[in-house]
């Protein structure tokens, strides 16, 4: 088995009484697009700074390709960082910006020229080497910053929220650019973001962080569909969180009491015990709405009324208030020609989902 490129072992970083990173351990593989995801203050940027060498852990160790990085200065690590601010020299051309770290390292001019040319090709800016940064779009400037980081051929590229300053359309375009670039150059990317959609779109694996700890480390599809905690379910995308109590366990099915709604079946996802408090996490797109629902033993359904709706173009978000006052968010596609919405505010509906559409987590 190939050893991991990066090993983070029991790393802790404190600032006075505040623990920014709390006993974090994880491994990152060669060629992986790995994302540290979490809200502000969760510790993701502090962890990134320790990987770069800008900060040091109070305890634990960080190993890159087997080497302990303790005491290794940032400029001596085979690691480069791309920041949100680009940090380009305004008085230098694009090519000169990219060449700068090579000149500082004393690389021969002939090799500098060849590597700058290749870096420009890698980021699809081969014809922009003579331009000044002010003559480029925001997305192009970000690509120059990435090219400058890649030109030294690092083993590891760290990206600290590099797309957050771009508008929504450009962010989507740059996400595709980053995916293609990472595949082309084969360098391991460690990406920091608070944007859940960005993390889901870009990553091979995601570490969801909360209060200095890793709450879940999995592939994007697993994190979205099978969150391990209430926090992960709530933080990743839209999710209905229904408090419940385990009533009985029968093989792979669990009978739960949805407080105020009654007993329903759900798929067993942890070693649930009768009487244990739990939360049914249910994505809005898993719920269907109808004026009436035909009884089905594998479905859960409740009566309610459309309380609010939000037209989003390709889908409409319906807020359905159930008979006990609980509210469910439901997403339905707007696929009917000439009809934007299926229901209006005030319409009586039934909300239904398959028993295995939700995912149970401990309360």
Curated annotation (Swiss-Prot):
Subcellular location: Cell inner membrane
Organism: Pseudomonas aeruginosa (strain ATCC 15692 / DSM 22644 / CIP 104116 / JCM 14847 / LMG 12228 / 1C / PRS 101 / PAO1)
Family: Belongs to the ABC transporter superfamily. Spermidine/putrescine importer (TC 3.A.1.11.1) family.
Residues that, per the record, bind ATP: 38-45
Free-text function comment from the UniProt entry: Part of the ABC transporter complex PotABCD involved in spermidine/putrescine import. Responsible for energy coupling to the transport system.
Gene Ontology CC annotations of this record: ATP-binding cassette (ABC) transporter complex
Record key words, sorted: ATP-binding, Cell inner membrane, Cell membrane, Membrane, Nucleotide-binding, Translocase, Transport
Occurrences of domain ABC transporter (ranges): 6-236
Protein EC: 7.6.2.11
A GO term, aspect molecular function: ABC-type polyamine transporter activity
Pfam families reported in the protein's UniProt record: ABC_tran, TOBE_2
Membrane topology: Peripheral membrane protein
Subunit structure of this chain's protein: The complex is composed of two ATP-binding proteins (PotA), two transmembrane proteins (PotB and PotC) and a solute-binding protein (PotD).
The protein's name: Spermidine/putrescine import ATP-binding protein PotA 2
InterPro entries: AAA+_ATPase, ABC_SmlMolc_Importer, ABC_transporter-like_ATP-bd, ABC_transporter-like_CS, Mo/tungstate-bd_C_term_dom, P-loop_NTPase, PotA-like, Transp-assoc_OB_typ2
Chemical reaction(s) catalysed: ATP + H2O + polyamine-[polyamine-binding protein]Side 1 = ADP + phosphate + polyamineSide 2 + [polyamine-binding protein]Side 1
């Amino acid at each position: 088995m190939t050893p991991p490129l990066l090993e983070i072992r029991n790393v802790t970083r404190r600032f006075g009484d505040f623990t920014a990173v709390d006993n974090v351990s994880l491994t990152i593989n060669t060629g992986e697009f790995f994302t540290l995801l979490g809200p502000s203050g969760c510790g993701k940027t502090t962890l990134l700074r320790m990987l770069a060498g800008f900060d040091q852990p109070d305890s634990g160790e960080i190993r890159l390709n087997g080497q302990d990085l303790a005491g290794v200065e940032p400029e001596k690590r085979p690691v480069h960082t791309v920041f949100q601010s680009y940090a380009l020299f305004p008085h230098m051309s694009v090519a000169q910006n990219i060449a700068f770290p090579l000149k500082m390292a004393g690389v021969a001019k002939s090799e500098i020229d060849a590597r700058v040319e290749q870096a420009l090709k890698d980021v699809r800016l081969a014809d922009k080497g003579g331009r000044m940064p002010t003559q480029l779009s925001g997305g192009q400037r970000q690509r120059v910053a990435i090219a400058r980081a890649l030109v030294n051929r690092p083993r590891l590229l760290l990206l600290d929220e590099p797309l957050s300053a771009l508008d929504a359309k450009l962010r989507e375009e740059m996400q595709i650019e980053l995916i293609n670039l990472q595949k082309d150059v084969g360098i391991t990317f460690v990406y920091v973001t608070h944007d859940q959609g960005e993390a889901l779109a870009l990553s091979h694996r995601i570490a969801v962080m909360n209060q200095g700890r890793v709450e879940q480390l999995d592939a994007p599809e697993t994190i979205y569909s099978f969150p391990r905690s209430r926090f992960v379910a709530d933080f990743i995308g839209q999710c209905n969180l229904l408090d419940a109590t385990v009533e009985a366990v029968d093989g792979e099915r669990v009978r739960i009491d949805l407080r105020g709604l009654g007993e329903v079946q759900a798929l067993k996802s942890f070693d649930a015990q009768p009487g244990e408090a739990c939360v049914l996490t249910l994505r809005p797109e898993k719920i269907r709405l109808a004026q009436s629902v035909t009884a089905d033993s594998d479905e859960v359904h409740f009566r309610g009324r459309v309380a609010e709706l939000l037209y989003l173009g390709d889908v409409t978000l319906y807020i359905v208030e159930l008979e006990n006052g609980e509210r469910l968010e439901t997403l339905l596609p707007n696929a009917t020609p000439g009809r934007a919405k299926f229901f209006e505010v005030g319409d009586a509906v039934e909300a239904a989902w398959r028993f295995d559409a939700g995912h149970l987590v401990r309360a």
